[in-house]
């Protein structure tokens, strides 16, 4: 039996990309997955995939920028299932590699609101239950853009640095309460993040250009000479949610094919 059997795990942004891959893996390992996101069609498809495989999952439309909606997602999971064992913050939008000069006020606000504020709101909502319970695992999906300065655009880089900083603070501050907070920092992963970000950003969306528009950039930047797949991120996430990571907190785990090791 998997150690995640019967555990209640809330995830934001679990309908696509790395989040979806995490949902599918953890549900297969027996976790009850409570998904919050705003892409309803993709959310429904993810829930169906889990249930068709015999797992348990549910989707709740949640805008992570909205305190009341995030609180409702987490509080609802506790109300319906009796507890929350884990939280994964995966909701994010991308800035299309927009430079500082090319970053509008609206783009900056939108990226920071989703990526940084959204992560904070979900962590806070979960901690309100985890701290009194004396246990809990939080995994934030950051990025190598939160560790270095030239992997992404200005607003995305700033937002992911914020996620890394928040992870370190919360991981240290709540360690004595039995709650661990860690992050995964993926590199270039094969997802629909650009198309989804254009949909989510709407009028605030910039051209999705930059380094990613060059088909050969991966060979130059990544020692493995390929992009990663979403399911290659899920092993670290599963580990950080488990008992094997009981002495790990405030840490950021890089999975980037060697990009930042050069």
What are these regions (language model features)?
Residues 3, 120-123, 131, 135, ...:
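C-terminal substrate-recognition "lid" of short-chain dehydrogenase/reductases
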Residues 143:
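Residue(s) in the substrate-gating loop at a strand-loop-helix junction
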Residues 123, 159, 167:
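Active-site helix of classical SDR
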Residues 13-16, 39:
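Conserved glycine-rich cofactor-binding loop
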Residues 128, 172-176, 246:
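Alpha-helical segment proximal to the catalytic Tyr-Lys
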Residues 98-100, 104-112, 138, 218:
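Substrate-binding pocket helix/loop in short-chain dehydrogenase/reductase
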Residues 88, 175, 180, 248-250:
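Short, small/polar-rich loop/turn modules that mediate ligand/substrate recognition or access, typified
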